[in-house]
């Protein structure tokens, strides 16, 4: 068993320690006797209430989820907050680096730039992909070609912005987070979620 698998099993064990009825109420989850259900970046997932395993919907079938970033983001979302009542979202958006002291967060520039280049010249395709994932287009901010509020988890959204490139400037992506986001996720998990969202958009536009 590699380190990733060990951490996934640790996530399962952590999830199983929680009062699932409280999680259902806290996050408004659909549920039955065997599973809890939630949507993550446009895909339906279910969590086995007995062993914590996560599966995703593929048509009429359910498939074991082996994507480390997806699994750990779902576990973290459900188990991160020790607060019985979560703070309401403020609608005040900020970059992820604002949550930490200067110089202490890893740079995501090369990672994000890869997706920005892939999206270059495809504003309409990116727009349609965001809509396909449940995104709601909002007013343009800071001159971005696209600004979308993207629902990524139950009642939890991020703001996705894309500037297409031209002769003077390269394409650019910026993800913004509500200022209370770290009441819902650990800081490290925001990087998993960001990667999963950009990957999902790219898969749709091809």
Give names to the regions the model predicted.
Residues 178-206:
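A recognition module on extended beta-rich or small alphabeta surfaces enriched in W/G with H and D/E
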Residues 44-69, 163-188:
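Intrinsically disordered, low-complexity regulatory segments enriched in Ser/Thr/Pro
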Residues 74, 78, 194-197:
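Short amphipathic C-terminal alpha-helix that caps PH/PH-like domains
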Residues 121-183:
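Conserved binding-pocket/active-site segment within a compact domain
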Residues 45, 100, 111-116, 142-144, ...:
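Domain-length accessory/inserted modules outside core catalytic folds
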Residues 24-50, 139-164:
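Amphipathic, interaction-prone secondary-structure segments
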Residues 1-34, 40, 70, 77-134:
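Short Lys/Arg-enriched alpha/beta "domain-start" segment
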Residues 64, 116, 146, 150:
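Short, charged/polar micro-motifs that form catalytic or ligand-binding hotspots
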């Amino acid at each position: 068993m590699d380190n990733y698998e060990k951490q996934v099993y640790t996530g399962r064990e952590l999830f199983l320690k929680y009062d699932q009825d409280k999680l259902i109420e806290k996050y408004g989850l659909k549920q039955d006797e065997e599973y809890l259900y939630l949507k993550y970046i446009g895909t339906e997932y279910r969590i086995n209430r007995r062993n914590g395993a996560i599966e995703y919907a593929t048509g009429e079938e359910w498939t074991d989820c082996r994507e480390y970033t997806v699994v750990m983001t779902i576990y973290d979302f459900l188990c991160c907050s020790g607060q019985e009542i979560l703070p309401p979202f403020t609608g005040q958006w900020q970059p992820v680096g604002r949550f930490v002291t200067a110089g202490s967060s890893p740079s995501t520039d090369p990672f994000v730039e890869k997706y920005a280049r892939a999206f270059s010249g495809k504003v309409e395709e990116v727009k349609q992909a965001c809509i396909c994932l449940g995104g709601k287009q909002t007013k343009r901010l800071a001159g971005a070609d696209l600004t979308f509020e993207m629902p990524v988890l139950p009642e939890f959204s991020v703001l996705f912005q894309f500037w297409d490139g031209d002769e003077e400037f390269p394409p650019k992506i910026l993800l913004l987070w509500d200022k209370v986001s770290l009441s819902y996720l650990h800081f490290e998990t925001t990087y998993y979620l960001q990667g999963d969202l950009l990957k999902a958009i790219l898969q749709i536009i091809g």
